[in-house]
């Protein structure tokens, strides 16, 4: 029985594929060990959301080839990096796939931005070995092979040598990496927002890191280097081509407790939040309710509908192609202080209009003081704090995510989205501080 911490780690690592739409009658061959992604697939099979999943090591894949068995999906996450003859295994993987099947391959990138920031190589545990293509690590006969990473072009060449045409291969860039797949971007898609407040870098050796990776993303995007320097890739190979790729971006919120764990999936014209397990269905129903609440108060909001697919909750909205309010406000600050203050004032007015407000009652002030008791205030300080609290407004139904990063700016209006958390009697000044902090 896993504890909650182990469950969270399991969910986070399974996020590399938990958003993917497998068919109910799918047969899956997983190549690797009994790791979180395989356990997730086992869970799908147990819940009859796929037909079956089989496990085999790369070394024993040839036995499957000899049996003549074919699978709808062949999946491997980083396992091929630990073997020398990757090309032979890729050919075997190709041979056990059904004609219209999919190969899903997770691979680390030796040119990942994390390694330029000082993180050590995943396999040699030394700095810059992958960037140098392991010329110092495996140049001598006596050197022991521990594993190695590849660049995107190297991976694609090996896949083509295994039998795939270049048009059969779709790639997704993974940040922060395969161990923490928080964001997944289609290769032809560029994020239209500053990711510094979105992606949280994770490192194998944080003590050797000397650059802040998250502050480099915008420069990589601007100079066309974002995908080439992704920390990892998910490759989806199939002979069946869609006219347009259905998924452009995935953001996972799986480090949360089970009842709030879901993935946000952006396609060409829709955005869908999908529950990781049915325990998160209620949180998506609340999201719909909060959206309707804002709409009822004439606050511009991206409206959506809740439904279920195979027992899992999904909240879907249309895709809005616009800059986030945070980007607009920070850009305004660079142009003119007057423009910046004008936008901030406009947002603060919308915040106050988002809920009925009233002055904090004595009971509410006492409750707030109790939470502040850890500050060690004396009697006079407590009395002053209580007086101050009772002269400040509270939002009767405050939305904790009512901040510029969860808003678009369209036609001189703030258009809110992703309003997950409602807190009754939320002090207005707390939210004003959150709004200000989210901009800076």
Identify the meaning behind each predicted range.
Residues 105-129:
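Conserved class I S-adenosyl-L-methionine
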Residues 87-102:
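A short glycine-rich, Lys/Arg-flanked "PGG" loop and its adjoining helix->strand segment in the class I
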Residues 124, 129, 381-440:
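Catalytic activation segment of kinase domains across protein kinase-like and atypical kinase folds
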Residues 241-378:
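Conserved ATP-binding subdomain of kinase catalytic cores across diverse folds
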Residues 74-75:
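Hydrophobic beta-strand segment of the Class I
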Residues 168-207:
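Conserved catalytic loop of SAM-dependent methyltransferase domains
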Residues 137-157:
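Acceptor-substrate binding/catalytic loop of class I
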Residues 6-26:
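Conserved alpha-helix/loop element of class I SAM-dependent methyltransferases that forms part
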